[in-house]
Amino acid sequence: MVDKYANWVSSGFGKSIAKKLGLPIPVKLKRYSEQKKPLGLEVLFGSFQQGRVAQSVKEILSHLPIVNYITEEGQIYRITEAGKMESKDDQLKFHGLIFDATEVKTLEDLKAVYNFFHPVARRIKSSGRVIILAKDPADCEDAVAAMANRGLVGFIKSLGKEVGQGIAAQIVLVSEGAERNLASTLDFLLSYKSA
């Protein structure tokens, strides 16, 4: 179906009128196409602690057709077959940001989530992806851990509104032992099929 408003706003005349009237100008989303499968998309992965989920996600990402980056102690490294190389490119933009917050147990631990996203939130490409992996609050040991994990839902909603530009922000609740089944979920969420 053709969106007449989007087409009108995309024209020079329509764009100038929309700006003067304060009307929203929709972002043109990238869509999945069998003929144009995206390869080599840059994905940055970080985690609060190196638990089972973080190890599983690193393994999964190494098998996807992406350029894999990790962050450790505030530094970004590119993962290659030879190992990890420090990334010196401050202008590098990412297709996806993935953060493993399944080990978050206290409200103070949520600072690690902020510390991961704050320096790179403006470095997400248009139609990019932001994914937080969190523990299901129902599986948490105590009320504080459940509150902290529930707070991640609010964080991802706020982040999604903040970054805009057609960027999809999602949270995946990971139950105990489900880290082995994350491959298809991450593959789908990182693809343009999930737009």
Per-region residue spans from a language model:
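Glycine-rich nucleotide cofactor-binding loops and adjacent beta-alpha elements
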Residues: 1-195
